[in-house]
Regions:
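A ligand-binding cleft/hinge motif common to bilobed small-molecule-binding domains
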Residues: 73, 77-80, 88-100, 145-149, ...
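Short, well-ordered beta-strand segments
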Residues: 27-30, 115, 132-137, 181
Length: 210
């Protein structure tokens, strides 16, 4: 199964520091600095989701102001407090997020993966995750996935890492300070070029809409 990418809308409240989003005005977008969302190349802002936001802004004659969050919890806090109108950051859909934010239609799907260091013990089943040192991004839907699995595998445990993207998780696996990491397939396919010894062991959970 797979997940998809979404744009989340904050729905500014009366106490929000921002005026409501309106045609011809400024739209404030919170994102992450990752190769799949927003980054600088030769002093020029780029990234798939950044280009989507620019296209949206052009359609409604808006100016774009970007804010960068350094972890998913920070991103969601900025959105919930009204510091941004939108979040565009390679976000996946989940029941928890749907209860708090309004999401766009998904525009791509990606599969969560368990990854490990080549040459280390490869897990081949969900039960084999028990007793392993697993890392996930704090605030990610993978935390929800693992929490659900823990109902059937009580020995399952993990560490939540506050980082912008999965590259830090993969570094922990490469450095052997973690056994396994849960990452999304699209980020993994890009980041693996930097860390080729980190390889996919198996899929976990359903693919999610972004």
């Amino acid at each position: 199964a797979c997940t998809g990418s979404l744009v989340l809308l904050s729905g500014c409240t009366d106490s929000s520091p921002l005026p409501p989003m309106a045609e011809g005005e400024e739209v404030v977008v919170v994102t992450r600095n990752t190769p799949t969302t927003y980054y600088f190349e030769s002093d020029r802002a780029s990234g798939f989701e950044y280009e989507l936001i620019r296209a949206f802004a052009r359609e409604y004659n808006m100016l774009v102001r970007i804010k960068v969050a350094f972890s998913l919890p920070e991103l969601f806090e900025m959105l919930a407090s009204g510091e941004a109108h939108l979040a565009a950051a390679g976000l996946s859909q989940s029941a928890g997020r749907d209860a708090q934010f309004v999401a766009s239609n998904p525009y791509l799907y990606q599969q969560p993966l368990v990854v490990y260091k080549s040459g280390a013990l490869r897990p081949r089943s969900l039960d084999a995750l028990a007793g392993r040192d697993i890392v996930v991004l704090a605030g990610s839907v993978h935390v929800e996935t693992l929490s659900a699995l823990q109902q059937d595998i009580p020995e399952l445990a993990w560490r939540e890492i506050h980082a912008a993207d999965s590259l830090e998780l993969m570094h922990l696996v490469t450095d052997e300070t973690a056994d396994l990491a849960i990452v999304d397939s699209i980020e993994f396919s890009i980041q693996q070029q930097l860390l080729p010894r980190v390889v996919a062991a198996m899929e976990i959970g359903d693919s999610t809409p972004n």
